[in-house]
Amino acid sequence: TPANSLSGTGINAQNNQATFAPVLNNLKTTSSVANFLIIPRTPQNCLGNPFPIVISVNPVATISTQKIVTCSGSSFVSSPINVPQNTSYTWKAPSLSTGVYVVSGNQNFNLIGDSTITGNLTYNGVDSGGISTYTITPKSGNCVGNPFNLLVTVRPLPNVSTASQIACSEAAFSSSPTSNLTNISTLYTWDLPVISPANSILGASANNSPASSISQLLIDTTSNVAQATYTVTPIALGCTGKPFTFIAVINPRPNFSNKDTTICPGYPFAMNPSPLPFITSYTWDAPIFNIQNAVIGGQAQPTPLPSFSQVLTNTTNSIDVMATYKVTPRYGDCVGKPFSLIVTVKASPYITDTLTSTVCSGNPFSVKMPKNLPLGSLYYLSLIHISE
């Protein structure tokens, strides 16, 4: 009892046996009882009175090969199932069955007996892991079962050195730093970064879901370089490595409002907007004039220059002309938003004809100026030559 709980030899009815020696196997994980009724018979074929024999058969743990996966340096626990209650285990130090690199910490042994199989192994390889094989002996009560194997796969821990990346403000960066592991994908989680200078960057956040790369879109709110310093945790094959530092260097994008200036014709002018990041450069398109064919000069500049400079000459003699440039600022590879530069080129009094006047000696003289000169023009008189 219970029914179908036992098997073995001598469990069925027998006749004319010289001894009573059944071999019974308990098929359950709890104790079973076999009730036999024995009828003795003498050599003269005389039958004696029947008598009972009751045999309690305790279970023996029968365990197939077990497998478990653990991370290097982490404790593992194995608890076989479908075994008799209060089964304990003993084992000796495991052996390394696969892997080129040594699995250390394998002096774990237990000769007294424990209810679970525990250990802590370290794997220093750079591949997918090594396997240590434990030979475990189960014991249920006083019944010792056959030894079985426990295969412990020890995964390596990813190790990543400090890494950094330079990115432009308002442009997403993505980085997958290389770990010490060979041909094994590494995932990353990270804490909220430390911003330097404080409050200079928008868009930074933590990420608790393992990602294949460190990626964010950060906005530098200043006109200078800013940094976001992340503490990143690498994860490979389900094992968590030591956190490392990742520094995102965010270059600003020059951002200027529209500018205007007024110049005299024929003289070079330069423009350096402020505030601006150092080493800002500029490109610009050819200007658009409000009066066509009224200005000489004004070319496009496709190659970045450290300042904006041109020479414009107003040929109208009397009307101010506006030149509108579309200017694109840059900081390194970071292109800012284009802005307009409106240059007003003043008209210059220009007289091509020789002006004459005849007066009597001792009397003042005046010279009538051309009508097409700029309003408000003033004149300076110098003696050039006296002829007789």
Describe the residue ranges of each PLM region.
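Solvent-exposed loop segments of extracellular immunoglobulin-like
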Residues: T1-N4, P84-S95, G99, T182-S196, ...
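Exposed beta-strand face motif in extracellular beta-rich ectodomains
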Residues: S32-F36, G130-Y134, A226-Y230, I319-Y325
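C-terminal edge beta-strand
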Residues: G48-N58, G145-R155, G241-P252, G336-A347
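Proline-enriched interdomain boundary motifs that mark the N-terminal boundary
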Residues: V60-Q66, L157-A163, R253-K259, S348-T354
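Short, solvent-exposed loop/linker segments at the N-terminal edge
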Residues: I68-S74, Q165-A171, T261-Y267, S357-N363
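A short beta-strand segment in extracellular, disulfide-stabilized domains
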Residues: S74-N82, A171-N180, Y267-P275, P364-K371
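Conserved small/polar residues in nucleotide/adenosyl-binding loops
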Residues: I384-E388
